[in-house]
Protein backbone atom coordinates (compact mmCIF):
# COMPACT_ATOMS: atom_id res chain seq x y z
CA UNK A 1 0.00 0.00 0.00
CA UNK A 2 1.35 3.42 -0.99
CA UNK A 3 2.39 5.76 1.77
CA UNK A 4 0.85 9.21 2.25
CA UNK A 5 3.94 10.81 0.71
CA UNK A 6 3.73 8.56 -2.37
CA UNK A 7 0.02 9.30 -2.77
CA UNK A 8 0.72 13.02 -2.50
CA UNK A 9 3.48 12.79 -5.11
CA UNK A 10 1.21 10.90 -7.49
CA UNK A 11 -1.60 13.43 -7.11
CA UNK A 12 0.49 16.62 -7.18
CA UNK A 13 1.76 16.28 -10.74
CA UNK A 14 1.85 19.09 -13.23
CA UNK A 15 -0.51 17.57 -15.80
CA UNK A 16 -3.27 17.03 -13.24
CA UNK A 17 -2.74 20.52 -11.81
CA UNK A 18 -2.84 22.08 -15.30
CA UNK A 19 -6.29 20.57 -15.89
CA UNK A 20 -7.70 21.62 -12.51
CA UNK A 21 -9.17 24.98 -13.52
CA UNK A 22 -11.29 25.33 -10.38
CA UNK A 23 -8.26 24.67 -8.18
CA UNK A 24 -6.19 27.28 -10.00
CA UNK A 25 -8.98 29.85 -9.58
CA UNK A 26 -9.15 29.07 -5.86
CA UNK A 27 -5.37 29.39 -5.48
CA UNK A 28 -5.28 32.72 -7.30
CA UNK A 29 -8.18 34.00 -5.19
CA UNK A 30 -6.40 32.94 -1.98
CA UNK A 31 -3.13 34.58 -3.02
CA UNK A 32 -4.96 37.76 -4.04
CA UNK A 33 -6.86 37.93 -0.74
CA UNK A 34 -3.67 37.44 1.29
CA UNK A 35 -1.96 40.15 -0.77
CA UNK A 36 -4.81 42.54 0.08
CA UNK A 37 -4.34 41.66 3.74
CA UNK A 38 -0.60 42.35 3.57
CA UNK A 39 -1.21 45.72 1.89
CA UNK A 40 -3.67 46.65 4.65
CA UNK A 41 -1.00 46.16 7.32
CA UNK A 42 0.84 49.17 5.83
CA UNK A 43 -2.11 51.63 5.97
CA UNK A 44 -1.56 53.71 9.17
CA UNK A 45 -4.23 55.02 11.51
CA UNK A 46 -5.17 58.68 10.94
CA UNK A 47 -3.97 61.24 13.48
CA UNK A 48 -1.00 59.23 14.76
CA UNK A 49 2.57 60.49 15.05
CA UNK A 50 4.46 57.65 13.27
CA UNK A 51 7.94 58.63 14.50
CA UNK A 52 6.87 58.89 18.15
CA UNK A 53 4.94 55.62 17.97
CA UNK A 54 7.84 53.77 16.32
CA UNK A 55 10.11 54.92 19.14
CA UNK A 56 7.57 53.89 21.79
CA UNK A 57 7.02 50.50 20.16
CA UNK A 58 10.75 49.85 20.04
CA UNK A 59 10.84 49.93 23.82
CA UNK A 60 7.91 47.49 24.09
CA UNK A 61 8.75 45.15 21.17
CA UNK A 62 10.77 42.80 23.32
CA UNK A 63 7.74 42.02 25.46
CA UNK A 64 4.31 40.62 24.84
CA UNK A 65 3.52 43.49 22.44
CA UNK A 66 6.08 42.01 20.04
CA UNK A 67 4.30 38.67 20.16
CA UNK A 68 0.96 40.33 19.37
CA UNK A 69 2.68 42.15 16.52
CA UNK A 70 3.66 38.75 15.11
CA UNK A 71 0.04 37.56 15.03
CA UNK A 72 -1.10 40.81 13.38
CA UNK A 73 1.49 40.52 10.61
CA UNK A 74 3.44 43.60 11.72
CA UNK A 75 0.35 45.85 11.74
CA UNK A 76 0.86 46.73 15.43
CA UNK A 77 4.41 47.90 14.78
CA UNK A 78 3.07 50.32 12.14
CA UNK A 79 -0.23 50.87 14.03
CA UNK A 80 -2.12 50.11 10.83
CA UNK A 81 -5.87 49.70 10.36
CA UNK A 82 -5.38 45.92 10.77
CA UNK A 83 -3.61 46.32 14.14
CA UNK A 84 -6.41 44.49 16.00
CA UNK A 85 -6.09 41.69 13.48
CA UNK A 86 -8.50 38.80 13.66
CA UNK A 87 -8.20 38.37 17.44
CA UNK A 88 -11.62 39.91 18.34
CA UNK A 89 -13.27 37.41 15.98
CA UNK A 90 -11.37 34.54 17.60
CA UNK A 91 -12.31 35.76 21.09
CA UNK A 92 -15.97 36.07 20.04
CA UNK A 93 -15.84 32.54 18.60
CA UNK A 94 -14.54 31.23 21.92
CA UNK A 95 -17.32 32.94 23.88
CA UNK A 96 -20.09 31.78 21.51
CA UNK A 97 -18.81 28.19 21.44
CA UNK A 98 -18.61 28.15 25.24
CA UNK A 99 -22.18 29.44 25.41
CA UNK A 100 -23.43 26.70 23.06
CA UNK A 101 -22.42 24.23 25.76
CA UNK A 102 -24.34 25.95 28.57
CA UNK A 103 -27.25 27.80 26.89
CA UNK A 104 -30.01 25.36 25.80
CA UNK A 105 -31.26 27.61 22.97
CA UNK A 106 -27.81 27.84 21.39
CA UNK A 107 -27.25 24.12 21.93
CA UNK A 108 -30.47 23.44 20.02
CA UNK A 109 -29.34 25.73 17.20
CA UNK A 110 -26.11 23.75 16.96
CA UNK A 111 -28.14 20.58 16.32
CA UNK A 112 -30.17 22.16 13.50
CA UNK A 113 -27.45 21.66 10.91
CA UNK A 114 -26.51 24.27 8.34
CA UNK A 115 -29.30 26.72 9.22
CA UNK A 116 -28.38 26.68 12.90
CA UNK A 117 -24.71 27.09 12.07
CA UNK A 118 -25.49 30.24 10.06
CA UNK A 119 -27.37 31.76 13.01
CA UNK A 120 -24.51 30.92 15.40
CA UNK A 121 -22.03 32.49 12.96
CA UNK A 122 -24.17 35.63 12.93
CA UNK A 123 -24.04 35.78 16.73
CA UNK A 124 -20.25 35.43 16.46
CA UNK A 125 -20.15 38.45 14.13
CA UNK A 126 -22.21 40.50 16.59
CA UNK A 127 -19.81 39.49 19.35
CA UNK A 128 -16.88 40.51 17.15
CA UNK A 129 -18.37 44.00 16.76
CA UNK A 130 -18.82 44.40 20.53
CA UNK A 131 -15.36 43.09 21.45
CA UNK A 132 -13.68 44.94 18.59
CA UNK A 133 -15.32 48.22 19.60
CA UNK A 134 -14.22 47.84 23.24
CA UNK A 135 -10.67 46.87 22.31
CA UNK A 136 -10.35 49.60 19.68
CA UNK A 137 -11.52 52.24 22.17
CA UNK A 138 -9.05 50.93 24.77
CA UNK A 139 -6.23 51.22 22.21
CA UNK A 140 -7.32 54.76 21.28
CA UNK A 141 -7.37 55.81 24.93
CA UNK A 142 -4.01 54.13 25.52
CA UNK A 143 -2.44 55.93 22.56
CA UNK A 144 -3.74 59.26 23.85
CA UNK A 145 -2.16 58.63 27.25
CA UNK A 146 1.25 58.20 25.61
CA UNK A 147 3.66 61.10 25.30
CA UNK A 148 3.21 62.76 21.90
CA UNK A 149 1.86 59.66 20.14
CA UNK A 150 -1.27 61.46 18.88
CA UNK A 151 -1.14 64.69 16.89
CA UNK A 152 -4.56 65.98 17.99
CA UNK A 153 -6.01 64.08 20.98
CA UNK A 154 -9.74 64.20 21.57
CA UNK A 155 -13.02 62.52 20.74
CA UNK A 156 -12.51 62.86 17.00
CA UNK A 157 -9.31 60.83 17.22
CA UNK A 158 -10.97 58.21 19.42
CA UNK A 159 -13.98 57.81 17.13
CA UNK A 160 -11.87 57.68 13.96
CA UNK A 161 -9.53 55.13 15.58
CA UNK A 162 -12.43 52.92 16.70
CA UNK A 163 -13.99 53.06 13.21
CA UNK A 164 -10.67 52.32 11.50
CA UNK A 165 -9.63 49.43 13.77
CA UNK A 166 -13.11 47.90 13.94
CA UNK A 167 -13.51 48.27 10.17
CA UNK A 168 -10.16 46.53 9.68
CA UNK A 169 -11.17 43.62 11.91
CA UNK A 170 -14.57 43.21 10.21
CA UNK A 171 -12.90 43.31 6.80
CA UNK A 172 -10.43 40.61 7.85
CA UNK A 173 -13.30 38.51 9.21
CA UNK A 174 -15.12 38.82 5.87
CA UNK A 175 -11.90 38.16 3.95
CA UNK A 176 -11.27 35.00 5.98
CA UNK A 177 -14.78 33.73 5.26
CA UNK A 178 -14.31 34.42 1.54
CA UNK A 179 -11.01 32.50 1.50
CA UNK A 180 -12.68 29.54 3.21
CA UNK A 181 -15.61 29.44 0.77
CA UNK A 182 -13.97 30.55 -2.49
CA UNK A 183 -10.29 29.79 -1.92
CA UNK A 184 -8.13 27.05 -0.42
CA UNK A 185 -7.71 26.30 3.29
CA UNK A 186 -9.17 27.87 6.42
CA UNK A 187 -9.28 31.63 5.82
CA UNK A 188 -8.77 32.77 9.42
CA UNK A 189 -5.81 30.42 9.93
CA UNK A 190 -4.28 31.48 6.60
CA UNK A 191 -4.47 35.17 7.57
CA UNK A 192 -2.54 34.46 10.79
CA UNK A 193 -0.20 32.19 8.80
CA UNK A 194 0.50 34.96 6.26
CA UNK A 195 1.34 37.44 9.02
CA UNK A 196 3.83 35.07 10.64
CA UNK A 197 5.47 33.97 7.37
CA UNK A 198 5.87 37.60 6.23
CA UNK A 199 8.21 38.23 9.17
CA UNK A 200 10.16 34.97 9.10
CA UNK A 201 12.92 36.43 6.85
CA UNK A 202 13.33 39.33 9.29
CA UNK A 203 13.55 36.91 12.22
CA UNK A 204 16.13 34.74 10.48
CA UNK A 205 18.17 37.78 9.47
CA UNK A 206 18.01 39.11 13.03
CA UNK A 207 19.16 35.77 14.44
CA UNK A 208 22.08 35.60 12.01
CA UNK A 209 22.99 39.20 12.86
CA UNK A 210 23.05 38.30 16.56
CA UNK A 211 25.43 35.49 15.67
CA UNK A 212 27.62 37.78 13.56
CA UNK A 213 27.95 40.36 16.32
CA UNK A 214 28.70 37.67 18.90
CA UNK A 215 25.50 38.13 20.92
CA UNK A 216 24.69 34.49 20.12
CA UNK A 217 27.42 31.87 19.94
CA UNK A 218 27.73 29.54 16.94
CA UNK A 219 26.89 26.40 18.99
CA UNK A 220 23.75 28.13 20.28
CA UNK A 221 22.63 29.04 16.74
CA UNK A 222 23.21 25.44 15.64
CA UNK A 223 21.22 24.23 18.65
CA UNK A 224 18.36 26.57 17.70
CA UNK A 225 18.37 25.26 14.12
CA UNK A 226 18.31 21.66 15.37
CA UNK A 227 15.47 22.52 17.77
CA UNK A 228 13.41 24.14 15.00
CA UNK A 229 13.90 21.14 12.67
CA UNK A 230 13.03 18.72 15.49
CA UNK A 231 9.88 20.67 16.41
CA UNK A 232 8.77 20.77 12.76
CA UNK A 233 9.33 17.00 12.44
CA UNK A 234 7.35 16.39 15.65
CA UNK A 235 4.47 18.57 14.45
CA UNK A 236 4.28 16.80 11.07
CA UNK A 237 4.38 13.37 12.75
CA UNK A 238 1.70 14.09 15.38
CA UNK A 239 -0.62 16.02 13.04
CA UNK A 240 -0.71 13.00 10.72
CA UNK A 241 -0.92 10.39 13.50
CA UNK A 242 -4.19 8.50 13.91
CA UNK A 243 -5.74 5.94 16.24
CA UNK A 244 -7.84 3.68 14.01
CA UNK A 245 -10.80 1.80 15.46
CA UNK A 246 -11.77 -1.36 13.56
CA UNK A 247 -15.34 -1.25 12.21
CA UNK A 248 -17.09 -4.37 10.93
CA UNK A 249 -20.26 -4.68 8.86
CA UNK A 250 -22.33 -7.90 8.92
CA UNK A 251 -23.22 -10.03 5.91
CA UNK A 252 -26.23 -8.74 4.01
CA UNK A 253 -28.52 -10.12 1.35
CA UNK A 254 -29.65 -8.00 -1.60
CA UNK A 255 -32.16 -9.92 -3.72
CA UNK A 256 -30.80 -13.40 -4.25
CA UNK A 257 -27.19 -12.35 -3.71
CA UNK A 258 -25.34 -12.59 -0.40
CA UNK A 259 -22.64 -9.95 0.22
CA UNK A 260 -19.76 -10.67 2.59
CA UNK A 261 -19.32 -8.48 5.64
CA UNK A 262 -16.93 -5.59 5.09
CA UNK A 263 -14.37 -4.03 7.42
CA UNK A 264 -13.17 -0.44 7.66
CA UNK A 265 -11.58 1.90 10.18
CA UNK A 266 -12.75 4.92 12.14
CA UNK A 267 -9.72 7.27 12.20
CA UNK A 268 -9.29 9.38 15.34
CA UNK A 269 -6.60 12.04 15.01
CA UNK A 270 -4.11 12.20 17.83
CA UNK A 271 -4.56 15.98 17.84
CA UNK A 272 -8.20 16.40 16.83
CA UNK A 273 -8.29 20.06 17.87
CA UNK A 274 -5.44 21.02 15.53
CA UNK A 275 -3.89 24.46 15.92
CA UNK A 276 -7.04 26.04 17.43
CA UNK A 277 -6.05 25.68 21.14
CA UNK A 278 -2.78 27.56 20.60
CA UNK A 279 -4.55 30.36 18.70
CA UNK A 280 -7.37 30.63 21.27
CA UNK A 281 -4.98 30.62 24.24
CA UNK A 282 -2.72 33.21 22.61
CA UNK A 283 -5.61 35.55 21.80
CA UNK A 284 -6.94 35.49 25.37
CA UNK A 285 -3.51 36.05 26.91
CA UNK A 286 -2.24 38.66 24.48
CA UNK A 287 -5.09 41.16 24.32
CA UNK A 288 -5.22 42.39 27.97
CA UNK A 289 -1.44 42.80 28.16
CA UNK A 290 -1.34 44.42 24.72
CA UNK A 291 -4.01 46.97 25.61
CA UNK A 292 -2.04 47.79 28.76
CA UNK A 293 1.10 48.07 26.66
CA UNK A 294 -0.40 50.90 24.62
CA UNK A 295 -1.21 52.85 27.77
CA UNK A 296 1.20 54.94 29.78
CA UNK A 297 2.37 52.65 32.59
CA UNK A 298 2.49 55.64 34.95
CA UNK A 299 -1.31 55.99 34.66
CA UNK A 300 -2.00 52.32 35.44
CA UNK A 301 -2.88 51.17 38.99
CA UNK A 302 -0.18 49.30 40.87
CA UNK A 303 -1.99 45.95 40.68
CA UNK A 304 -2.42 46.32 36.90
CA UNK A 305 1.29 47.04 36.42
CA UNK A 306 2.15 43.97 38.52
CA UNK A 307 -0.16 41.72 36.45
CA UNK A 308 1.15 43.06 33.14
CA UNK A 309 4.71 42.45 34.31
CA UNK A 310 3.88 38.91 35.46
CA UNK A 311 2.24 38.16 32.09
CA UNK A 312 5.39 39.13 30.19
CA UNK A 313 6.60 36.75 27.54
CA UNK A 314 8.61 33.90 29.08
CA UNK A 315 7.50 34.70 32.65
CA UNK A 316 6.34 31.74 34.83
CA UNK A 317 2.74 33.00 35.20
CA UNK A 318 2.45 33.47 31.42
CA UNK A 319 3.71 29.93 30.79
CA UNK A 320 1.41 28.35 33.40
CA UNK A 321 -1.70 30.15 32.12
CA UNK A 322 -0.73 29.46 28.51
CA UNK A 323 -0.31 25.74 29.17
CA UNK A 324 -3.56 25.52 31.15
CA UNK A 325 -5.52 27.29 28.41
CA UNK A 326 -4.02 25.08 25.70
CA UNK A 327 -5.04 21.95 27.64
CA UNK A 328 -8.55 23.30 28.25
CA UNK A 329 -9.16 24.29 24.64
CA UNK A 330 -7.70 20.99 23.37
CA UNK A 331 -10.45 19.09 25.21
CA UNK A 332 -13.12 21.72 24.63
CA UNK A 333 -12.61 22.04 20.88
CA UNK A 334 -12.33 18.26 20.45
CA UNK A 335 -15.74 17.92 22.10
CA UNK A 336 -17.12 20.49 19.63
CA UNK A 337 -15.76 18.99 16.40
CA UNK A 338 -16.27 15.29 17.29
CA UNK A 339 -19.39 13.86 18.93
CA UNK A 340 -19.00 10.17 19.92
CA UNK A 341 -22.78 9.71 20.32
CA UNK A 342 -23.52 10.92 16.78
CA UNK A 343 -20.75 8.71 15.41
CA UNK A 344 -22.09 5.67 17.29
CA UNK A 345 -25.64 6.37 16.06
CA UNK A 346 -24.44 6.62 12.45
CA UNK A 347 -22.55 3.34 12.77
CA UNK A 348 -25.62 1.62 14.20
CA UNK A 349 -27.84 3.06 11.46
CA UNK A 350 -25.58 1.61 8.75
CA UNK A 351 -25.08 -1.73 10.50
CA UNK A 352 -21.49 -1.11 11.57
CA UNK A 353 -20.07 -2.12 14.94
CA UNK A 354 -16.78 -2.28 16.84
CA UNK A 355 -15.85 -5.93 17.57
CA UNK A 356 -16.59 -6.80 21.19
CA UNK A 357 -18.58 -3.58 21.81
CA UNK A 358 -22.38 -3.47 21.77
CA UNK A 359 -23.78 -0.96 19.20
CA UNK A 360 -25.38 2.23 20.48
CA UNK A 361 -24.63 3.67 23.91
CA UNK A 362 -21.76 1.28 24.69
CA UNK A 363 -20.06 2.14 21.39
CA UNK A 364 -20.39 5.88 22.15
CA UNK A 365 -18.83 5.31 25.59
CA UNK A 366 -15.96 3.32 24.09
CA UNK A 367 -15.24 5.94 21.41
CA UNK A 368 -15.33 8.67 24.08
CA UNK A 369 -12.98 6.57 26.26
CA UNK A 370 -10.42 6.25 23.44
CA UNK A 371 -10.84 9.87 22.30
CA UNK A 372 -10.30 11.23 25.82
CA UNK A 373 -7.04 9.35 26.21
CA UNK A 374 -5.58 10.33 22.87
CA UNK A 375 -6.66 13.93 23.53
CA UNK A 376 -4.51 13.84 26.68
CA UNK A 377 -1.55 12.94 24.45
CA UNK A 378 -2.55 15.68 21.99
CA UNK A 379 -2.81 18.29 24.74
CA UNK A 380 0.60 17.34 26.18
CA UNK A 381 2.07 17.54 22.68
CA UNK A 382 0.59 21.02 22.13
CA UNK A 383 1.88 22.27 25.48
CA UNK A 384 5.33 20.81 24.79
CA UNK A 385 5.56 22.32 21.31
CA UNK A 386 4.25 25.75 22.35
CA UNK A 387 5.89 26.22 25.75
CA UNK A 388 9.31 24.53 25.72
CA UNK A 389 10.72 26.53 22.77
CA UNK A 390 9.26 29.72 24.28
CA UNK A 391 11.14 29.05 27.54
CA UNK A 392 14.41 28.45 25.69
CA UNK A 393 13.91 31.50 23.46
CA UNK A 394 13.11 33.77 26.41
CA UNK A 395 16.46 32.79 27.90
CA UNK A 396 18.45 33.38 24.69
CA UNK A 397 16.74 36.46 23.24
CA UNK A 398 15.94 34.89 19.86
CA UNK A 399 12.99 36.55 17.99
CA UNK A 400 9.50 35.23 18.77
CA UNK A 401 8.92 34.09 15.19
CA UNK A 402 11.03 30.99 15.80
CA UNK A 403 8.90 30.01 18.81
CA UNK A 404 6.78 26.90 19.17
CA UNK A 405 3.41 28.62 18.65
CA UNK A 406 4.44 30.24 15.37
CA UNK A 407 6.01 26.99 14.11
CA UNK A 408 2.87 25.05 15.08
CA UNK A 409 0.62 27.47 13.19
CA UNK A 410 2.83 27.59 10.09
CA UNK A 411 3.32 23.81 9.82
CA UNK A 412 -0.29 22.88 10.70
CA UNK A 413 -1.83 25.38 8.28
CA UNK A 414 0.58 24.24 5.55
CA UNK A 415 -0.38 20.58 6.08
CA UNK A 416 -4.09 21.42 6.06
CA UNK A 417 -3.81 23.53 2.91
CA UNK A 418 -1.75 20.91 1.05
CA UNK A 419 -4.32 18.26 2.06
CA UNK A 420 -7.11 20.39 0.57
CA UNK A 421 -5.12 20.89 -2.64
CA UNK A 422 -4.60 17.13 -2.82
CA UNK A 423 -8.35 16.61 -2.35
CA UNK A 424 -9.13 18.92 -5.27
CA UNK A 425 -6.59 17.11 -7.47
CA UNK A 426 -8.07 13.71 -6.59
CA UNK A 427 -11.55 15.04 -7.42
CA UNK A 428 -10.18 16.29 -10.75
CA UNK A 429 -8.76 12.82 -11.50
CA UNK A 430 -12.09 11.17 -10.71
CA UNK A 431 -13.92 13.62 -12.98
CA UNK A 432 -11.54 12.68 -15.80
CA UNK A 433 -12.17 8.95 -15.23
CA UNK A 434 -15.95 9.47 -15.20
CA UNK A 435 -15.83 11.44 -18.45
CA UNK A 436 -13.71 8.72 -20.10
CA UNK A 437 -16.11 5.97 -18.96
CA UNK A 438 -19.09 7.93 -20.32
CA UNK A 439 -17.35 8.40 -23.68
CA UNK A 440 -16.56 4.68 -23.88
CA UNK A 441 -20.12 3.82 -22.95
CA UNK A 442 -21.43 6.14 -25.67
CA UNK A 443 -19.18 4.55 -28.31
CA UNK A 444 -20.33 1.05 -27.33
CA UNK A 445 -23.94 2.17 -27.55
CA UNK A 446 -23.37 3.20 -31.14
What is the role of each PLM region?
Residues 2-110, 115-446:
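N-terminal cationic and glycine-rich segments that engage phosphates or anionic surfaces
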